[in-house]
């Protein structure tokens, strides 16, 4: 269970660019 359902959680570029998913 990570941010955006990706292993890197919010540290990945996609999640940094889409912070609202957190």
Curated annotation (Swiss-Prot):
Gene Ontology molecular function, alphabetical: sodium channel regulator activity; toxin activity
A cellular component annotation (GO) from this entry: extracellular region
Tissue expression summary: Expressed by the venom duct.
Major localisation: secreted
Subcellular compartments: Secreted
Disulfide topology: 3-15, 4-21, 10-22
Residue list for modification Pyrrolidone carboxylic acid: 1
Disulfide bond as UniProt keyword: yes
Top-level taxon in the UniProt lineage: Eukaryota
Sequence positions bearing Cysteine amide: 22
UniProt keywords, alphabetically: Amidation, Disulfide bond, Ion channel impairing toxin, Neurotoxin, Pyrrolidone carboxylic acid, Secreted, Toxin, Voltage-gated sodium channel impairing toxin
Similarity comment text for this entry: Belongs to the conotoxin M superfamily.
Function comment: Mu-conotoxins block voltage-gated sodium channels (Nav). This synthetic toxin potently blocks rNav1.3/SCN3A. It also moderately blocks rNav1.1/SCN1A, rNav1.2/SCN2A, rNav1.4/SCN4A, mNav1.6/SCN8A, and Nav1.7/SCN9A. sodium channels. This block is very slowly reversible.
Domain remarks: The cysteine framework is III (CC-C-C-CC).
General remark: Negative results: does not inhibit Nav1.5/SCN5A and Nav1.8/SCN10A.
Protein name: Mu-conotoxin MIIIA
Species of the source: Conus magus (Magical cone)
């Amino acid at each position: 269970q990570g941010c955006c359902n990706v292993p890197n959680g919010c540290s990945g570029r996609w999640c940094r660019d889409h912070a609202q998913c957190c």
